């Protein structure tokens, strides 16, 4: 079985911790079994492995999130990067092409699609195993997971099973199919509250965005748009796929569709209010909480302390991107305000580690300076590169590494300073965990001002 995890999102609903470069699934805010903290994406992959579902995990993502996935999960997962952000159908089509043409998977192999940021329990993954079994037994071409609703939500699409109007008939209809599978009658997009109540009376399920099918089934659909011999060709012609969701392009057009019900813990931690319910503590980071706070949470990623006192139903979040103080009931509005911000992300994860912007200044003559603290994980390196519009000064503050400037190597340690003129090739590799301060001077100071010559050395 092959598992494709979808990783996307713009990262605005949990601002200031999330941003365009760090979506919610990468925030290490959940309690880990080892006593530390883990992100949503780390939690889901851990649960998949604990359930022994499969070792064959492929991420379908965009270029911005690729490095974060590798940084948090290592090299044990495959990552398929779409050339541009489109929608779930082209992303799934590209990942399926990767399995078929790059990994040489058989057409009969079962593929499961699921989101990477779901907050759920072990029964969820047992339900996925039932979906796989249903596909293997040819119950339907496409099998979905149906989440048993807990209230008439307007936030989710619904899956309506065929000829089911009571709990008894659900049980009766189940016996027709393998492992609690029900035939799907129709799909309904996000309804208003009254329509949602009617759907619940029809025993409809929330569409949880989990699909199972044979690889050959999906490749037949892919070939309707792009027929190539190699994955690289498909990747180059990616824009020929329609910009449309998998639900619209595949699920709603499928002639043979079944749904496997799931009843259990299932949450979208995409709002501050929902996330606070699962935080392991009322405060994370350098936070001091007074004695008279009520239902208040604080998360601080800055080095300076945050003190909370006399607050009720409030969320306080501080990061290099900004500071938010918000009533919990109004926390869903934060995305509207975050969308108005035009500043660059101040914190990013890369395949080699992380960086944080400390200062960004423009001087009277138009020259700019940008100061970062950069952390390289032991054994990792940044690419051999040059810049056309800026010089850089690096100051090593922790650890040891190997610095290269125009082909000349030298060992560096805490206290060493490295000057990099405009247009000169340079790189650094961490012998141990390595932290250095980078000061860029020039104009413009943008991430795109980089010409890479070698990624690994």
Description of each model-found segment:
Residues 213-418, 424-430, 445, 451-456:
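Left-handed beta-helix
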Residues 41, 95, 117, 159, ...:
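Residue-level signal for inorganic ion chemistry
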Residues 6, 114, 396, 439:
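Catalytic metal- and UDP-sugar-binding loop of GT-A-like glycosyltransferases, i.e.
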Residues 437-445:
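C-terminal structural segments of small proteins and small subunits
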Residues 2-5, 15-20, 28-115, 119-126, ...:
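Conserved N-terminal catalytic core of the sugar/cofactor nucleotidyltransferase
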Residues 11-16, 23, 447:
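Short N-terminal binding/cap micro-motifs at the start of the first secondary-structure element
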Residues 121-238, 258:
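Conserved core of the sugar-phosphate nucleotidyltransferase
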């Amino acid at each position: 079985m092959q598992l494709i995890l979808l990783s996307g999102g713009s990262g605005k609903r949990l601002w200031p911790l999330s941003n365009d470069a760090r979506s919610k699934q990468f925030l290490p805010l959940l309690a880990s079994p080892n006593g530390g903290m883990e992100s949503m994406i780390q939690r889901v992959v851990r649960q998949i492995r604990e359930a022994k579902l499969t070792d064959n995990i492929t991420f379908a993502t965009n270029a911005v999130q690729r490095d974060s996935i590798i940084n948090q999960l290592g090299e044990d997962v495959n990552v398929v990067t779409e050339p541009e952000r489109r929608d779930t159908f082209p992303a799934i089509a590209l990942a399926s092409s990767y399995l078929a043409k790059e990994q040489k998977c058989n057409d009969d192999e079962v593929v499961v699609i699921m989101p990477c940021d779901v907050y759920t329990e072990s029964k969820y993954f047992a339900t996925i195993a039932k979906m796989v079994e249903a596909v293997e037994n040819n119950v339907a071409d496409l099998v979905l997971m149906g989440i048993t609703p807990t209230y008439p939500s307007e936030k989710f699409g619904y899956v309506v099973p065929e000829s089911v109007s009571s709990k008894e008939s659900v049980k009766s209809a189940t016996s027709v199919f393998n492992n609690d599978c029900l035939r799907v009658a129709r799909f309904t997009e996000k309804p208003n509250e009254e329509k949602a109540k009617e759907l619940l009376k029809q025993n409809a399920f929330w569409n949880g965005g989990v699909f199972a099918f044979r690889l050959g089934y999906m490749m037949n659909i892919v070939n309707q748009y792009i027929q190539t011999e190699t994955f690289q060709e498909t990747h180059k012609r990616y824009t020929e796929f329609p910009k449309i969701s998998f639900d619209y392009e595949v699920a709603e057009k499928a002639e043979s569709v079944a749904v496997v019900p799931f009843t259990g813990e299932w949450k979208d931690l995409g709002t501050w209010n929902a996330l606070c319910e699962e935080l392991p503590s009322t405060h994370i980071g350098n936070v001091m909480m007074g004695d008279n706070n009520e239902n208040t949470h604080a998360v601080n990623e800055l080095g300076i302390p945050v003190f909370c006192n006399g607050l009720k139903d409030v969320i306080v979040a501080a990061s290099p991107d900004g500071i938010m103080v918000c009533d919990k009931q109004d926390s869903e509005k934060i995305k509207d305000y975050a969308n108005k911000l035009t500043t660059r992300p101040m914190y990013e994860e890369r395949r080699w580690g992380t960086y944080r912007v400390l200062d960004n200044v423009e001087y009277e003559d138009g020259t700019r300076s940008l100061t970062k603290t950069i952390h390289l994980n032991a054994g990792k390196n940044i690419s051999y590169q040059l810049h056309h519009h800026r010089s850089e000064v690096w100051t090593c503050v922790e650890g040891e590494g190997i610095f290269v400037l125009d082909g000349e190597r030298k060992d560096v340690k805490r206290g060493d300073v490295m000057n990099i003129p405009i247009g000169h090739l340079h790189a650094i590799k961490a012998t141990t965990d390595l932290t250095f301060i980078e000061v860029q001077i020039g104009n413009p100071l943008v991430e795109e001002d980089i010409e890479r010559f070698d990624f690994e050395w």
